[in-house]
Design a protein with these regions (language model features):
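Long amphipathic N-terminal alpha/beta scaffold segment
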Residues: 1-20
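Catalytic core of Fe(II)/2-oxoglutarate
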Residues: 56-131
Length: 131
């Protein structure tokens, strides 16, 4: 899992990320799974907008109440933010997980935004379930 989750605030009249993208555009593994956990209601223009199928361009908001979350394919689906025209800020946490059988300890790829290599101890931590 992503060692340090991303904390985001999307204030009114602002965006939370720089531009429309797929996470693979920033060196992420095509096998990563995104988690989006809003800490305030996420709706309308104060949330993430994403297409439903890669390349379709049918952008819709990921709307959720506090306590709800999304598991989605941010690696392959183009997504971003619109300018928040609501009068409410959105506060959220997002993070990524990678199935261990898809992990490549020899990768040279690194996170563009964090400058961390996509390896255990740098970008990722390992979750070991207790029996």
């Amino acid at each position: 899992y992503q060692k340090s989750p991303t904390f985001r605030v999307q204030a009114p009249n602002n965006i939370a990320v720089g531009g429309w993208h797929r996470d693979r555009d920033y060196n992420h593994s095509p096998h990563e799974i995104n988690m989006f956990l809003p800490l305030t209601p996420a709706y309308g223009t104060n949330t993430i907008w994403t297409e439903s199928i890669e390349g379709l361009g049918d952008y819709k908001p990921l709307e959720a109440e506090v306590g709800e979350y999304y598991v989605w394919d941010g690696v392959n689906l183009n997504h971003g933010n619109k300018v928040n025209t609501t009068n409410k800020s959105r506060v959220s946490i997002d993070f990524r997980v990678l199935p261990y059988d898809k992990y490549d300890p020899g990768t040279e790829a690194f996170s563009v935004s964090r400058g961390k290599k996509f390896i255990l101890g740098d970008y990722y931590s390992l979750y070991e379930a207790k029996k």
